[in-house]
Amino acid sequence: MREPGRPPPIRTDDSNAFANNTMRVRLPAIIDQTIAANDDYPASIKERLSQLRGEIAAGARIHGLPDASSPDASDWAGALRRQREILNAEPTWHNVEWFFAETYAYRCLIDAVRWWESGRDPFLPVKREELNSERLWALLDHATEPTDSAAEALRRLVAFDLWANRIDLSYAASMERGTRIDEDDLLVDERGDLLAYLAKSAGGSRQFYGDGTIYLVADNTGSELALDLALSDCLLRHVMERVVICLKAHPTFVSDATPADVWMILAEMTARGGSAAALAQRLRAYWASERLRFLPQLYWNSSRFLWDLPWSLRNRLNIARLVIIKGDANYRRALGDCLWPAHTPFSQVMDYLDAPVLCLRTLKSDPVVGLPSAETAARLERIDPDWRVNGKRGLIQFKAQTSKSQQVAVAG
């Protein structure tokens, strides 16, 4: 469903080269890698994965889920029906909305490996590879070095949490770049607005928006999740009362974080000792006291855009002190996966959420808003035609509260 005034979502046909290539080449390659990484899968699972791979690459007709008893089956049936209504024809992998196609492809993969029965993460071998990388732990140590002030710690951690996206298991170009950052890679930096808001909300007047909870919509596990947890620790120590980390209910997009990934990385932090173990100890204490929560929901695996939230989740986010949206796929979900003019104000596009919003995103797909001017996008096109999709550039974008009707005053 598209909100009035929004451009139409990107499609998987040849109207968008990157989306079309994703379905023809990138996703089939990921399925091949999944088969290779799980050599002990029974032949029946490998056959189902190979069939799915072939159907996606060839642009075959999209079928409904075979198991109607799964908890999300009716939602996906409705999503497929909507694609059929939009097309007035049978949906194929190469003629539907891209966000639907990608999310549904991973849902079909989960069905093919019988995840609902086994709970076995088909992407675990790849996730463990990054978790065992010394680069991850060096990055975490560097990001959590002592600073002169809470504000400086937050400023540093927000930047590290953004650029940790460059180590993303489904995106080879980002892996090649590692964590090396050029100054002009950060296209928008609104950390100043964020820090001013957080300082005001924690100030002597005690006037602030929301209920004192930050919702962090997580993206990838590994380096990014480690930095999400470090940022949560900093916020809980210096600014906020509670942090809720929103997670995927089942594995998807290769590296997206689930509750199992959180506990796996906490165990690895503890085993590493030193500052990582101390961080894990604090995080476990926050969790025990319910200041830190992990909230998996099938919504985050769905093809729904962010304005199409379940009511219970919408109500929670709308009264949050801050909503942090992480990563490229969540950015696409927030924008409607469509091609706004790149200089469209971020606050205008996100005005459907009442709460203040922070987006941390490295660009790995075409949608982008909030650039300083139309000339910024034109200049980037001249110097780097792949600037929207190659994972090199990033955004730190902040929107203040949209509605003042929920302003909360707490007696000092």
Q: What spans do the regions from the language model cover?
A:
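Gly/Ser/Thr-rich loops at beta-strand to alpha-helix junctions
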Residues: 96-100, 218-226, 250-252, 328-333
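Histidine-anchored nucleotide/phosphate-binding helix
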Residues: 223-245
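Structural motif
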Residues: 213-215, 321-322
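Short, flexible loop/turn elements at secondary-structure junctions
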Residues: 107, 218-222, 298, 361-364
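Short amphipathic alpha-helices and their capping/turn segments at secondary-structure boundaries
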Residues: 194-197, 234, 311-318
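Non-catalytic accessory regions outside enzyme or core folds
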Residues: 1-211, 397-411
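C-terminal functional extensions of proteins
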Residues: 2-4, 11, 247-249, 255-412
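Residues at the starts of beta-strands that form the adenosine-phosphate
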Residues: 213, 241-244, 356
